[in-house]
Every structure is written in C-alpha cells, then in structure tokens.
Amino acid sequence: MDIKTIGVEEWLNVWEKSATWDIAQSTISSLTMGELRALDDQDGATFYERLDREKMNYGWIEGSPEFKAEVAKLYRREVNPDHILQTNGCTGANLNAIMAVVEPGDHVIAEWPTYAPLYEIPRTLGAEVEYWELREELGWRPDIEELKRLVRPKTKLICINNASNPIGTVLDADTLGQIAEIARSVGAYVLCDEVYLPLENTEDFMSMADVYEKAIVTNSVSKTYSTPAARVGWVVADEEVSNRIRTYRDYTMICGGVFNDALATYVLEHKDKILERNRKIVFGNRDIAQAWIDAQHRVSWTAPQGVSTSFIQLDIPEHDEEFCKRLLAERGVLLVPGSRFELPCGARLGYCASEDVLREGLRLLGEALAEFDR
C-alpha cells in the first residue's frame, strides 16, 4: 500500500535535532519531569506510588479505568468508558478511527489545509476525498454553504481539525452544530481531531462529541497538556465504531503500557494546573509574536485563537522551504515551511516555545528577513 509522506513530519524528522532555536513545534512548551512532579505538591509521590504498585506488564489494554475516568471528565455528556479507547497519541487515534470507518469507494470530505493524515489516510484506503477549504478571505474559516454543496447522500465521513493545524482556526459551538446538522442529513460520521484545545473563549468551545451522536473525537496529552513524551491519546466513538477500532488497535498498538498510562492519567488529574500554566504561555507568547510581526513588513498572520499552532505568511522572493533550510543552516532557527502543509509562501510558527527561545528565534528570523531589503 502506497501512502504519501506526512510533509511536516518528514521535515521535522530530518531537521529538528539540528535546531538551536526551535520555533516550529505546536506543543505548548513541554513540561519537564521536575514540573510534572511538582503538580501534586508532593514531589510526584502520588505518581510514583501508583507505579510502585504496578507490575511492568502490558497493563490495561484499552487504558486503565482511572485513565478513562479522567478522559470522560473532558466532555459535557456522559461517555461510556467502553467507548473510550487509548491510542498511540492522537495520530494513532486518527489512523485507527479512519481505518474503522472508511472503505474503498466511500466519499469523504476533509477540511483543508490541515494535518495530512486526515485526508491522506482516507485517500490511501480508496476513498474519494474532497476538500472543504479554510478560506483566507474569510479569515481562514470554512464556508458552511460550501459544505452543503459538497455533501452527498452517500458521504461516509467528514474530517475536521478543531483547532486547525497549522493555521489555528477554532470552530465555535454554533459552527459545529451546523456541521452536525449537515452530517446528520446524510448519516455521515464526523471525525474531529481536538488535540489543540483553545485556552480562551472556552465558553464558546464544545467537543464534537457533545454536539453529534455520530461524532468520532480524537485527542492526546501531547499538545495542550504539554506531555508528548507520554505518547498517549484516545478516541471516543459510538459502540459500533469503537468495536471496529478495537480490532485495528490489536494490529497497531495492543496497549499503551503501564508507565505511559500512569503518566497520562496523572497529567489529566492535574490538568487545571497545567492549563493555568499554559494560558500564561499562550497569551504572553502571542503578545510577543504579535509585537514582532507588527514590526515586520514581510510577515503577517491571523492571530491564533488561544491555541498553540499558528501560520505566518512570508512576503519573500524565495521558496519557503529553501528559506527555512537557509535559516536553520545560518542561524540555527527552525520553522516548518508552509509548503509542507501545501501552503506555500509561509511557515508554521511554534510560538508556544519557551519565552527565551521564542524571542531569540524571532530576532534571528527578523535578521534573515531584513537581508531581502539590502
């Protein structure tokens, strides 16, 4: 089976370890083990005591009861624990969910631009994939009327990313309700990758799981919860889809493992402290980035809506990938070129790095851009 490379992952696999100033990532500045230990005010005693009781075997295949209980708290409706399945990050959740639903010849609508697996996996499985575009002239938002035109009586799946990667667009509860109404009219599933939880205007945000009965939602502790090292995600779906996913999980991961499950559970148990920390990073760093952009005549963006991923447009006479390679080689600064998201003439800016990395990365990026004016 041939499948396209994921442009952003291929880029990071090659270049991220060469960076001195990494402002490409979309995780909110990753927690150190020291910061994690401090969450329980007992130097991590509750985490280590849990591990001390456990044998280092496979553990709970689908995720421990404690893990599932913490995940269930993230949704407004009551979620059956049997419908929460632990996965290898959100990437694994998306893979298993799409494989469980999509068959050759199916019609799939995918938000675009977005994280490539949401449209490349269905295409590789033999589906006809049409794009529902985020439009720059609409402030990088999609047009609901366009979705109505795209949907067909036999549309099987609509894939969305809320918030979107790399642009950072957040679809509010009203928009999700309209998507649900359109999907319901033809009986389509809606897969919503929710790994980027918005940290502002949260009263306007709802999970697709709380909006639509045929929603499939995916998430992880990697981005908003700053713990990608755990490699733990989850998928929430109805009984039929959950049972199909169980079969695919046996082929793709078996289990998350005792240690990873315990770490992810501990993170979710202390999510309020983590989110308080991360709001300060998101809002403070966004202000830093905005001030820098305001002083740059070659850079623009639509400011992200309280999420950790953003896209800057670059007005430069050089292909974005060549510019990013040169920026890394000459100044040690890492961005992800927009062409890796099929968005040329820009870059993903990981503005939620540590403040010192962001400030120096932007300063050096500004130096590189100034060279075009000499």
What are these regions (language model features)?
Residues 148, 317, 326-335, 341-374:
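PLP-dependent enzyme catalytic core of the Aspartate aminotransferase-like
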Residues 125, 185-186, 296, 331, ...:
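Helix C-cap/helix->beta junction micro-motif
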Residues 2-89, 269-270, 371-374:
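N-terminal small-domain helix-loop-helix segment of the aminotransferase-like
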Residues 136-203, 210:
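Active-site phosphate-binding strand-loop segment of PLP-dependent enzymes
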Residues 44-45, 82, 100-160, 181:
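PLP-dependent aminotransferase-like
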Residues 106, 127, 185-188, 213:
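A short helix->loop->beta-strand "cap" motif at the edges of active sites that frequently abuts
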